[in-house]
Curated annotation (Swiss-Prot):
This protein's domain notes: The PX domain mediates interaction with membranes enriched in phosphatidylinositol 3-phosphate.
Residues binding a 1,2-diacyl-sn-glycero-3-phospho-(1D-myo-inositol-3-phosphate), per UniProt: 53, 79, 94
Name this polypeptide is given: Sorting nexin-10
Species: Homo sapiens (Human)
Described function: Probable phosphoinositide-binding protein involved in protein sorting and membrane trafficking in endosomes. Plays a role in cilium biogenesis through regulation of the transport and the localization of proteins to the cilium. Required for the localization to the cilium of V-ATPase subunit ATP6V1D and ATP6V0D1, and RAB8A. Involved in osteoclast differentiation and therefore bone resorption.
Disordered, as annotated region: 156-201
PX domain ranges (all copies): 10-127
Length: 201
């Protein structure tokens, strides 16, 4: 008998559906939906979506770099002083750059084991709460934060809508940043260790 053929693992990520969000009367920003589909043992739930803004990506890159000093991290799209959120070309160039960044990050096994990355991709927590959770300063664990968000957000976008939405921007949306349906990273039980130890600042 032949040994059972192992399935090749994959992690697919899309950054899509940019939306203008109102911060206050004078200030707005754009956030992007990050969707993941995977069969990787590092993830328990195989599909996830969350909304993040550019400055959260900047924080994530800094966080990952501080936790993996010897890893050469991919670059983010540069911060353009003349960035115009009403310019579709500007928005789509940034969206594509953010997607390329995440795709490269998710190909690195060391970065994929970082709890900060999992919480960024699979929870509603902001950067301060992610840092607190990873360093053990919250009542909930990394896994609990992700599972709670997964229970609150079960819907995942239809794949056949991806092509329509990927490059569209909703200029009238004032909805809050919320995810749709999330996966968890109970990866310690699958041999993919997630770093939850406190980090030195």
């Amino acid at each position: 008998m032949f040994p059972e053929q192992q399935k090749e693992e994959f992690v697919s990520v899309w950054v899509r559906d940019p939306r203008i969000q109102k911060e206050d009367f004078w200030h707005s920003y754009i956030d992007y939906e990050i969707c993941i589909h995977t069969n990787s043992m590092c993830f328990t739930m195989k599909t996830s979506c969350v909304r993040r803004r550019y400055r959260e990506f900047v924080w994530l890159r800094q966080r990952l770099q501080s936790n993996a000093l010897l890893v050469q991290l991919p670059e983010l799209p540069s911060k353009n002083l003349f960035f115009n959120m009403n310019n579709r070309q500007h928005v789509d160039q940034r969206r594509q750059g953010l997607e390329d960044f995440l795709r490269k990050v998710l190909q690195n096994a060391l970065l994929l084991s970082d709890s900060s990355l999992h919480l960024f991709l699979q929870s509603h927590l902001n950067s301060e709460d992610i840092e607190a959770c990873v360093s053990g300063q919250t009542k909930y664990s990394v896994e609990e934060a992700i599972h709670k968000f997964a229970l609150m957000n079960r819907r995942f976008p239809e794949e056949d809508e991806e092509g329509k939405k990927e490059n569209d921007i909703d200029y009238d949306s004032e909805s809050s940043s919320s995810g749709l349906g999330h996966s968890s990273d109970d990866s310690s039980s699958h041999g993919c260790k997630v770093n939850t130890a406190p980090q030195e600042s």
